[in-house]
Regions:
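Core segments of transmembrane alpha-helices
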Residues: 57-64, 141-162
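Membrane-proximal helix-loop-helix units in multi-pass membrane proteins
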Residues: 153-178
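The first (N-terminal) embedded transmembrane alpha-helix
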Residues: 49-70
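Alpha-helical membrane-inserting segments
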Residues: 65-68, 94, 98, 102, ...
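Extended non-transmembrane interhelical loops and adjacent amphipathic helices
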Residues: 119-126
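Cytosolic/stromal cytosol-facing helical appendages immediately following the last transmembrane segment
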Residues: 1-50, 81, 109, 113-116, ...
Length: 287
């Protein structure tokens, strides 16, 4: 295992509530105490939310496998090889872009109490700036449950598309295969994000982070520097330099502001402690 330097974040009071229900630490709770990027709170989904997360976490990969099969059976071996060679990087890049859009939206618009999106999307992202390593205490369901819940309906729609057409064209089969890879990459994004904050990872993950196949801690640190308004893409971060260079998100904000949709500065500034903190110290190992 590769030992990483500690990654303390900005000082903040221990939170009293989180997007899921929380409970105090006990001697048997394997969650680090407050400090060094941790809130000291064990996160646990509410009962109904937890049921949905568990069902979707285990349903999603089954749907992926079924859809990959039905898409692949319409392709020759040569076509399938071409689709995989071209489709994997396309899906990986597209997932990085969409992860950036979602992250930017959650950081910039709405509030903790925004219907539907507030509790399960906006609040967790913003609290993550204060307690960056809390994500490392999440089990698989807490890590990808919400992502699977959002992606599973897309897989159901894809399955209907593949089964409702008696003669799926090669083009449609190839697009379906790549779309499947894209949803898989989107679900994997929060795992890659979690690894970018982890104190320890195995040698393979560390190697893939250093080679920038996965999101690296050093690169992700750029987002965790106040005012937390850049480098939003968190699948691998490949698109961040380009999007920052063309001021993509600032231009998006200007466009939306022109039609009356303005960033929620008061809510976001409160979470980033008025954007006046010194940059958070994080893991700056090579990567």
């Amino acid at each position: 295992m590769n030992q990483r330097p500690s990654m303390p974040t900005q000082t903040a009071p221990a939170r009293k509530s989180i997007s899921q229900s929380s409970q105090p630490l006990s001697s048997s709770t394997p969650v680090p105490a407050a400090g060094d990027g941790y809130s000291g709170i064990k996160e646990k989904s509410g009962s109904l939310h937890s049921i949905i997360e568990h069902v979707m976490t285990y349903t999603f990969p089954l749907l992926c496998a079924v859809n990959l099969y039905f898409a692949a059976r319409e392709l020759s071996w040569v076509s399938l090889a071409v689709v995989i060679i071209l489709g994997v990087p396309i899906a990986w890049i597209l997932a990085d872009f969409v992860s950036g859009l979602i992250h930017w939206f959650a950081d910039t618009y709405g509030a903790d109490d925004t219907p539907l999106f507030g509790p399960w999307l906006i609040k967790p992202f913003r609290q993550h700036h204060l307690y960056a390593r809390d994500i490392c205490t999440h089990n698989l369901v807490l890590t990808i449950g919400n992502s699977c819940t959002g992606a599973a309906p897309l897989q159901v729609g894809l399955l209907y598309f593949l089964l409702s057409d008696d003669d799926v064209s090669i083009t449609n089969a190839a697009l379906a295969f790549v779309f499947n890879l894209f949803t898989m990459a989107m679900v994997a994004t929060n795992v890659l994000h979690k690894w970018a904050h982890a104190e320890k990872t195995n040698w393979l993950v560390s190697r893939l982070q250093r080679s920038r196949v996965f999101l690296s801690p050093a690169h992700h640190h750029l987002h965790h520097t106040p005012p937390f308004d850049s480098n939003y893409c968190i699948t691998n971060g490949w698109l961040n330099p380009l999007l920052e260079r063309i001021r993509f998100f600032r231009n998006m904000e200007a466009t939306l502001s022109a039609i009356g949709i303005k960033p929620n500065e008061s809510s976001y500034a409160a979470v980033s402690l008025s954007r006046n903190l010194a940059p958070a110290k994080t893991d700056l190992r090579e990567g």
